[in-house]
UniProtKB/Swiss-Prot annotation:
Organism: Bos taurus (Bovine)
Region described as Disordered: spans on this chain: 149-170
Protein name: Ribonuclease P/MRP protein subunit POP5
Gene Ontology biological process terms from the UniProt entry: rRNA processing; tRNA 5'-leader removal
Keyword Metal-binding: no
Keyword Zinc-finger attached: no
Location, primary (coarse class): nucleus
Gene that encodes it: POP5
Misc. remarks from the entry: The last C-terminal 19 amino acids are not required for complex association and RNase activity.
Positions of modified residues (Phosphoserine): S158, S160
Keywords from the named record: Nucleus, Phosphoprotein, rRNA processing, tRNA processing
Organism classification: Eukaryota, Metazoa, Chordata, Craniata, Vertebrata
Any Pfam family: RNase_P_Rpp14
Localization per record: Nucleus, Nucleolus
Entry similarity comment: Belongs to the eukaryotic/archaeal RNase P protein component 2 family.
Coiled coil (residue ranges): none
Length: 170
């Protein structure tokens, strides 16, 4: 049996209007990307990318989107994303664009990148904050994310099947 290889595009919906993110739906976003691929690459691009294309993850609050497509045609999807200029949902049109953050072979690599990306964003916010209350809240978030990462790393080591460090032979 042959495994189908996919690529995952981790994108961020960037918009000045905060209502744009709150009205996001995976069905609408998937249709928008498919229509844009058809407009940019024609019927060949639409047919090639429709096989295996899916919106795997969508967070309406942060605007993070994870798109899955076949490995052979991920460049077609990737090259069509800059042509998305607005999101139309429920009769409203919101100007926005998709910023591609990472292209990965697994969902896990995209998750690891997203954790690092969010940590960098928190550190940038920490440098730019003016109020002491904001500064404490951001420092608390950074500390919490570091503690969660250490716990998950500890769990991965304990799940390695009992192959901890061996004692050196003398």
């Amino acid at each position: 049996m042959v495994r189908f290889k996919h690529r995952y595009l981790l994108c961020e919906v960037v918009s000045d209007d905060p209502r744009c993110r709150l009205t996001l739906e995976d069905r609408v976003l998937g249709t928008l990307v498919r229509d844009t691929i058809a407009r940019v690459h024609g019927t060949f691009g639409a047919a090639a990318c429709s096989i295996g294309f899916a919106v795997r993850y969508l967070n309406a609050y942060t605007g993070i989107v994870l798109l899955r497509c076949r490995k052979e045609f991920y460049r077609l999807v990737w090259s069509a994303l800059p042509f998305i200029t607005s999101l139309e949902n429920k009769g409203h049109r919101y100007p926005c664009f998709l910023n591609t953050l990472h292209v990965g072979g697994t969902i896990r690599t995209c998750q690891k990148f997203l954790i690092q990306y969010n940590r960098r964003q928190l550190l940038i916010l920490l440098q730019n904050c003016t109020d002491e209350g904001e500064r404490e809240a951001i420092q608390k978030s950074v500390t919490k994310s570091c503690l969660l990462e250490e716990e998950s790393a500890g769990e991965e080591l304990s799940d390695s099947g009992g192959e901890e460090t061996a004692e050196p032979m003398e």
